[in-house]
């Protein structure tokens, strides 16, 4: 048996950037007679790429840069590390955050001198313990005065003198027999009851009322002569006002304009009146501006004596010229100044 304990070093991936931390941990373990025979990254063990042998190590050390209160460790690996440890082996590097998982997997938590988890021996946990059974106490118990305690016997059916009770018979009810002399009284009606037909009478009365009302209406219309009082439709029309328009338009008192426009399905003549007004306005506008054929032809500056027109801004430069101006691209000039190639030779 070697002098050093076999150990396993599990490293957090962030520790790979500080190799001096790993060397210091190995040096401290060597001072405690612990030799790390294996060294793995925790993520390799978590994804299953590395498997551990059962009961191989005496010490497992988890090295992480995280604080004790912020350690994040896969809970499923606690049972794997418990299987890889020998009985009474220690697990170093985890905190009380996983205290419940440690107790479930058979670890005992040690706080002094250094915090660690110790794997308990399963053989001791399963060891049977004999429990002595209690013996029956005899009745030889004595009081302080030396006298024995009184004994009591269970009463039996032969020795018990309890009173017995019997169920009383039900009392018979008296039977009444009929005798020949007893006869039940009989009742007879002196006269037959009268039956009144109320419903039929009411129905007959209502029928009589309806018939009487119908007959009275018929007599009224027979007496009234409608031939003399009939009025023809044409008589209702006044001869003087037959040609006048019965529809009056409401106009505003200030602007003297109509307040209401014609409806979509106008039948009163308002729509035609509005169309006539619009046509009159358009005809007046056409009379204001009217061009001749010469004025409507395209302006050509190459023809001598041809009247030309423009906006009057041709001499100011391109920024003030129209899109069809023939002077586009030429410099500004004075109105009436003749333009030739010599005057613009510097700009060409």
UniProtKB/Swiss-Prot annotation:
Pfam families: CIAPIN1, DRE2_N. [2Fe-2S] cluster binds at residues 252, 263, 266, 268. Residues 1-158 are annotated as: N-terminal SAM-like domain. GO terms for cellular component: cytoplasm; cytosol; cytosolic [4Fe-4S] assembly targeting complex; mitochondrial intermembrane space. Keywords: 2Fe-2S, 4Fe-4S, Cytoplasm, Iron, Iron-sulfur, Metal-binding, Mitochondrion, Phosphoprotein, Ubl conjugation. Residues 311-325 are annotated as: Fe-S binding site B. Residues 137-170 are annotated as: Disordered. GO terms for biological process: cellular response to oxidative stress; iron-sulfur cluster assembly; negative regulation of hydrogen peroxide-mediated programmed cell death; negative regulation of nitric oxide biosynthetic process. Residues 252-268 are annotated as: Fe-S binding site A. It comes from the Eukaryota. [4Fe-4S] cluster binds at residues 311, 314, 322, 325. Ubiquitinated. Present with 1050 molecules/cell in log phase SD medium. Belongs to the anamorsin family. This is Fe-S cluster assembly protein DRE2. It comes from Saccharomyces cerevisiae (strain ATCC 204508 / S288c). The gene is DRE2.
